[in-house]
């Protein structure tokens, strides 16, 4: 029996839909962030703070890899959601096959280029003479199996659009549990250090990818693997990459930003500051991933109803998502203000680094209550196919505000200036997002009134 078309996206109450789609996505995103947290916690406690600094130097690599994965995965997810809303099932099927092909091509090219120039790239990304060996060991493993990571992230996103949010969540959770079980084995028992953490991550992602491919190989699925869908089609590739360009540019800019942050931390605070930034990044990442999970829950709902011209439901899911995201970032703000040392100790017992991380976290969350809404607005435009606005919002925080902040503020405030550049950029980008959303709502409602 063929899988039921997910028409519930246009029929069920928005609150129930968002809960059904967002909760699994949130758990999946938090679980995904736990891959890095588990690795860093074991590395910080059992390998040392220099290894933790080396791992921080790999952050730009992770952002760049995520950029290519998101360009294909998020773009394909949006195209599939809209096509399902339009009842265009043949195109949705072809998008699935094209996603696999694109991930194989881009993942392979990324691996070849980065492995060829690995040491110079890591030095540019902020690795010092003492942290470079650790960063190199980790990235050699991660890059060698990069195609697996790309394919896993892309197909996991498509599972949600295809009506399997709970399965997507379950596979991610299973992957994290496997990773958490393998980390002590490879890092401590087999004494493989930071290389063992990378191997554990790759094994866990490989198992999750195999399960996803098994699910999509079933002919009972509305979207399933079959001959004829893997050959790249220009129209699908164009639309997928155009919509995926927003997260690609956002992650690419994040790569540049983290590069500058790493180098500034190294310049103004040394290896300890670099390790402290890695801790702060990991803590804040959890809250951001919860917001991203809300966005992933919103995406198929907004995309389907936009394609079905049910604008009231589109605005409703946006309001619900923004409210939930703001609640999440308020919790992050309170954590950073009142108990920043507690999460920092997950990663290290070095009191100097814990103190530096707590101080930096407290500064970073100054504007956090507003950040959730800004992120939701950017992904909302992406969900309804308005790639240009989404790209602009993604770039405004990184290029227009954050990079100048990183370059200017430390000259006057030293290491604190590096930390303060982040809430400064958040405040400015929130103003831009609110303005664009106000204009979009007004524009659509005026069109609806003219048709009435």
Predicted regions and their residues:
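Short alpha-helical transmembrane segments in multi-pass integral membrane proteins
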Residues: 1-22, 80-147, 189-244, 302-367, ...
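Residue-level signal for short hydrophobic patches within transmembrane helices
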Residues: 11, 15-34, 38, 61-68, ...
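Transmembrane helical elements of multi-pass membrane transporters/channels
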Residues: 20-39, 141, 175, 204-208, ...
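Residue-level hotspots within pore-lining transmembrane alpha-helices
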Residues: 31, 35, 65-69, 109, ...
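Helix-terminus/linker motif at the lipid-water interface of multi-pass membrane proteins
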Residues: 34-53, 122-129, 185-192, 252-282, ...
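Membrane-helix interface/capping residues of multi-pass secondary transporters
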Residues: 40, 49-52, 89, 118, ...
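Small-residue-rich hydrophobic transmembrane alpha-helices
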Residues: 52-112, 149-168, 276-334, 338-340, ...
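Short runs within selected transmembrane alpha-helices of multi-pass transporters and secretion channels
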Residues: 73, 141-160, 171-179, 197-210, ...
């Amino acid at each position: 029996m063929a899988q039921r078309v997910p028409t519930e996206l246009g029929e069920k109450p928005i609150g129930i839909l968002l809960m059904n789609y967002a909760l699994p996505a949130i758990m999946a995103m938090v679980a995904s962030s736990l891959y890095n947290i588990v690795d860093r916690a074991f590395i910080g406690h059992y390998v040392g703070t220099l290894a933790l600094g080396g791992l921080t130097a790999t952050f730009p690599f992770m952002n760049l890899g995520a950029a290519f994965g998101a360009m294909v995965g998020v773009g394909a997810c949006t195209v599939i959601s809209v096509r399902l809303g339009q009842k265009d099932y043949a195109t949705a099927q072809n998008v699935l096959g094209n996603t696999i092909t694109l991930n194989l091509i881009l993942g392979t090219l990324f691996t070849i280029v980065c492995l060829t120039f690995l040491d110079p790239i890591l030095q540019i990304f902020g690795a010092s003479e003492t942290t470079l060996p650790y960063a190199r060991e980790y990235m050699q493993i991660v890059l060698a199996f990069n195609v697996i990571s790309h394919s896993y992230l892309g197909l996991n996103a498509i599972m949600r659009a295809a009506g399997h949010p709970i399965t997507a969540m379950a596979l991610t959770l299973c992957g994290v549990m496997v990773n958490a079980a393998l980390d002590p084995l490879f890092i401590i028992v087999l004494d493989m250090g930071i290389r063992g953490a990378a191997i554990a991550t790759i094994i866990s992602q490989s198992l999750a990818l195999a399960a996803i491919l098994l699910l999509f190989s079933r002919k009972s699925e509305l979207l399933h693997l079959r001959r004829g869908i893997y050959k790249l089609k220009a129209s699908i590739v164009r639309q997928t990459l155009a919509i995926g360009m927003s997260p690609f540019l956002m992650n690419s800019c994040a790569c540049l930003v983290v590069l500058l942050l790493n180098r500034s931390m190294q310049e103004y605070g040394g290896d300890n500051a670099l390790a402290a930034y890695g801790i702060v990044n990991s803590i804040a990442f959890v809250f951001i991933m919860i917001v991203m999970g809300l966005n992933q829950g919103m995406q198929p709902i907004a995309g389907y109803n936009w394609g079905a011209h049910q604008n009231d439901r589109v605005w409703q899911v946006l309001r619900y998502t923004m409210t939930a995201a703001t609640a999440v970032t308020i919790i992050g703000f309170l954590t950073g203000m009142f108990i920043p040392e507690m999460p920092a100790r997950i990663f290290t017992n070095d009191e100097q680094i814990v103190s530096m991380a707590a101080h930096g976290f407290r500064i970073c969350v100054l504007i956090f209550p507003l950040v959730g809404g800004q992120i939701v607005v950017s992904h909302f435009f992406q969900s309804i196919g308005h790639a240009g606005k989404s790209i602009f919002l993604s770039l405004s925080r990184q290029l227009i505000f954050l990079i100048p902040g990183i370059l200017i503020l430390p000259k006057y405030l030293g290491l604190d200036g590096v930390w303060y550049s982040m809430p400064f950029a958040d405040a400015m980008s929130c103003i831009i997002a609110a303005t664009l959303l106000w204009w979009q709502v007004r524009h659509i409602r005026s069109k609806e009134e003219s048709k009435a």
